[in-house]
């Protein structure tokens, strides 16, 4: 009986150890890049939140105003999490929360059919982008066997150049969809005008910038620039996006 008890105890310890190994070893990553984006998030979100007090008052019942504020708080915190976590799985959770909450804020005024249509287009496009990100992250995981940023960065040196090119394209499409880079911008001119003014300002001023953070973090910090055509392609897409933005 004692032997079986000991075996059971050690099996239990082994199971607990395996479960602990699955947990992120580095939950947060605070460096100049993340701190800069955190500063931008809170500097822009705070006045927008204050503005919403007067904007929503008189337009909606108190219960709906309270719901709006709860969604807004979750929205801001999820954006802060996106730029400060150090693990891909936690990053994806924060990214998904940010996307879903921003969708509910876009369709906040359910009496307008255009809001529903804009929100539907937005949520479809954002999940297409997320699918590309998941594919890129899984390719990185094949080499790192870990979802922690620093481990992925160290393992990225062993990734073949051709594979790095594929991962770069997946990341560019995934984050480019959220950033509104042409031609992945089709959701942006519909969703932003339909969202309440304070939400539109946060989405355009902060949320789409989290995608820029993602490109910098995963392409430059983790993957490592592999070829000059990466920078050239980003520059060309940025110039085209600027031109289309001016025309709009």
Task: Put a short name on every predicted segment.
Residues 47-66, 72-91, 101-248:
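Hydrophobic transmembrane alpha-helices and their helix-loop junctions in integral membrane proteins
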Residues 1-70, 145-156:
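Transmembrane helix-loop-helix hairpins at membrane boundaries of multipass inner-membrane proteins
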